[in-house]
Amino acid sequence: MTNYRSKIKYKYVGIDPGKSGGIACIDEDGKMKAYKCPDSSEDMAILFEVIIGDTPPSNIRLLMERVWARPTNAVRAAFSYGTNYGQWLGIAASHEVKMNTAIPSDWIRWIGCPKALKSVIRKRWLKDKAKECYPKLKKITLKTSDAILITKYAKEDYFNEK
């Protein structure tokens, strides 16, 4: 019996939904690409279209970091974060791409980030980890590193398709 699933090539997309976040993808040939989040919803939609290209929606594995407002968030920051999150949800839905979400601690723990690092140190650690995982990828920044690692987590663990 032939395993047809193994012959299907998927495109993996990971999104860090913050305004200072990013979007990354591993294409059907295994090449990683990463982009900072555009400033406008129109540019977000255009970038999403470029990323998915002509890949059928059923062959796209999309994972976005699940976010929520916390008591320590300023109202304006929480609203901005939620706005971006909702825009990505709408963009994916308009392309009939199923949106999956994961809480930050799931992918951060999986990638091996030490516990109890302060935010700035953790962000630098994650950026360095993304560079270690994808040394040929140019311009890995604080804006793209989380999306890169979310995409890696999506492919290798969440969808379990190494």
Which ranges hold each PLM region?
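Phosphate- and other anionic-substrate recognition elements at nucleic-acid/protein interfaces
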Residues: 1-162
